[in-house]
Amino acid sequence: MISSSGFFNDGSADSPKLRVYLNMDNLGDLRTDSSWPHLEEFSGYQRLVADGFEGVQLTTNDTALATAPIPYCGLDRINTPAEADKVAAKHAERGDLCITVHAGWGLEDEDATSRLVEAILTASSQRRLPIFIETHRATITQDLWRTVQITKVFPEVRFNGDFGHYYCGQELVYGDWKSKLEFMAPIFDRVGFMHGRIASPGCMQVSIDSDLTARPRQAHGEINYLDHFKELWTRAMLGFLRTAQPGDVLIFAPELLSGRNYYARMFPNSAGTLFEETDRYAQALLYKDLARACFAEAAKLVKECD
């Protein structure tokens, strides 16, 4: 259900909370030596629960999980205003708690962008389905300036924060980092869902190490991208907590994609065969713990400000 704050609400009187889901695309094309046991359907969902995940984000055409022991949400793409209600109706019928969407292609002018956002907000309201517009390249939110303008026209808009698209796609570290974070405040304040993916300034998906307090070995350049993502995530979580109502839920879903679409980096092994850089399931488990640490830090900051 949709809260009066525009976020997903579980109907409880609980304080606003974080729930860590797993985007199911994270399990696609994993390395043969992955720590994921390649379980299917019910047994797979049981394993995810045992590993500490609290839900899953299904892909567009997955079937409903009527008997699965785990909550689920969805994702899709809305290219035109005419598609908005059809997409929302499909996911409401499947029983999704909420959905994230790629909206448009980034070629829309101001008027077309406004009509698309308005249609998405209308569909969300009519279907009682929270819809979070994803911050993503090749969409209407592909750059910071345009996304902030959307918040001025539609202050009720809510986002799925996938910040790697800005961090890498707009090379956030090139220039004044702090001023860019301040500019992003209207985005942070409207994040109701988060995709977990850490990028470097030049690569969309890079690895972290098991010691979440240490600089990753792959952060070999001038900056520590892990520290930057901790700050991005904590700011978004702080924005959520400042406006969330009782029962509101912020979903964080690791979405570490395979090398098939050039997200996971591939390197030759000793036999010359290309091999993914990391076990993406093991990385998702680290993200789970990292997200919870960031949320705890955001909650601490809220209390300090009260």
Where are these regions (language model features)?
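Histidine-acidic metal/acid-base catalytic patches
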Residues: 2-46, 153-157, 167-306
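Acidic-and-aromatic substrate-binding clefts and catalytic sites of carbohydrate-active enzymes
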Residues: 35-38, 53-66, 76-85, 105-112, ...
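Catalytic domains of carbohydrate-active enzymes, especially glycoside hydrolases
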Residues: 36-63, 90-98
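Conserved, mostly hydrophobic/aromatic
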Residues: 48, 91, 131, 162, ...
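Structured helix-beta-strand junction loops
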Residues: 51-52, 127, 190
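Conserved beta-strand positions in the central sheet of alpha/beta enzyme cores
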Residues: 55-57, 73-74, 98-100, 160, ...
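Short, well-ordered beta-to-alpha junction loops that form the rim of enzyme active sites
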Residues: 61, 135-136, 254-258
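Active-site acidic/histidine proton-transfer and metal-coordination neighborhood
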Residues: 69-159
